[in-house]
Design a protein with these regions (language model features):
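N-terminal Rossmann NAD(P)H-binding glycine-rich loop of SDR-like oxidoreductase domains
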Residues: 3-23
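C-terminal amphipathic/interface module of NAD(P)-dependent oxidoreductases
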Residues: 211, 227, 243, 265-298
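A conserved pocket-lining segment of Rossmann-fold NAD(P)-dependent short-chain dehydrogenase/reductase
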Residues: 174-201
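Glycine/proline-rich active-site loop of Rossmann-fold NAD(P)-dependent oxidoreductases
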Residues: 154, 165-174, 209-219
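NAD(P)H-binding glycine-rich loop region in Rossmannoid oxidoreductase-like domains
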Residues: 35-36, 41-90
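Active-site Tyr-X1-5-Lys
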Residues: 132-156
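Conserved Rossmann-fold NAD(P)-dependent oxidoreductase catalytic core, especially the SDR/UDP-sugar
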Residues: 92-133
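Mid/C-terminal beta-alpha module of Rossmann-like enzyme folds, strongest
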Residues: 205-262, 296-298
Length: 298
């Protein structure tokens, strides 16, 4: 089987390549940079224009579209424009390429649970409606999904994905760093829900989706056990052998996230309580179902 991964040169992409290549699949990575990715052929593209050099690879492939800049940045208009453009432009280009050079047998379109905005205690399923939330969250996600609406493929799955817990990612590195400095208390009330998935379960879930042809449309790729922020921080302190730390007030998060960490405070102050209904109904088993299991390897 040929698997084409757009945006597959990042941390998560490289682990996906390793997994799929080990299974004997042919893996092609589309990257804006001329880099080496073990287990894959790397084809350079600009994400904006169609070239036969890479577009011909789409015919009868499994296409996984991971394209997009990290959300871990201050939410200025310029940065939000970048977040949206880095997702929408490559997706539009892939849609055009599939029309011109050949239809993938499966289109896996990355998306995010942030499409639901700040959902409070509401339990979110694949039937839940997107929210009119902050543009950098719900707005970008809706534009991203809309760009793939006319994708030409035999089967298409929109992967509304939780926070992927993977060592080495910027957001998790920051949480580990501040917790090691004895600053790992809950954020604000600590009641905001965190939907998450261990990166190994994320990879296994994609494998499962590829093989189960009854899965299509929106699929939540998230652990069945979301936790509140206060639980996440407690388990992180436990994993790193740190004592209780005082809560961080919301106003300090709003200032500190922007000034000290150059990131979006809403990443910590908003939450979503999602469940992977379709995966559970099809019998998918999560190996890392509890947050303490996922944090053991930090």
């Amino acid at each position: 089987m040929k698997i084409v991964i757009a945006g597959g040169a990042g941390t998560l992409g490289r682990d996906l390549v390793k997994h799929f290549a080990t299974q004997g699949n042919e893996v092609v990575v589309l990257s804006r940079r001329n880099v080496s990715v073990e287990g894959a052929r790397v084809l350079v593209w600009d994400g904006r224009s169609v070239s036969e050099d890479w577009a011909r690879e789409l015919q009868d492939s499994v296409l996984l579209n991971l394209s997009g800049e990290l959300v871990d940045r201050v939410p200025t208009k310029a940065n939000i424009d970048l977040l949206e453009r880095s997702r929408v432009e490559p997706t539009n280009t892939l849609v055009q390429a599939a029309r011109q050079f050949g239809t993938p047998k499966l289109w896996l379109q990355m998306s995010t649970l942030a499409i639901y905005g700040d959902a409070g205690d509401q339990i979110l399923t694949e039937a839940s409606l997107p929210a009119n939330g902050p543009r950098q969250m719900a707005g970008v996600a809706k534009a991203w999904e809309a760009a793939s609406a006319d994708a030409s493929s035999i089967r298409k799955v929109i992967l509304r994905t939780a926070v992927v817990l993977q060592p080495g990612t910027p957001a998790l590195n920051r949480l580990v760093r501040i917790t090691k400095l004895f600053l790992g208390g809950q954020v604000a009330s600590g009641k905001q829900w965190v939907s998450w998935i261990d990166y190994r379960d994320f990879i296994r879930a994609l494998d499962f989706i590829m093989k189960d042809e009854s899965l299509n449309g929106i699929v939540h790729v998230t652990s069945p056990n979301p936790v509140q922020n206060k639980t996440l921080m407690r388990e992180l302190r436990r994993a790193l052998e740190r004592p209780w730390s005082p809560p961080t007030p919301a106003f300090l998060i709003r200032v500190g996230a922007r000034v000290l960490f150059r990131t979006d405070p809403l990443l910590a102050l908003t939450g979503r309580r999602a469940t992977p209904m379709k995966l559970l109904e099809r019998g998918f088993h999560f190996q890392f179902g509890s947050i303490d299991q996922a944090l053991k390897d930090l």
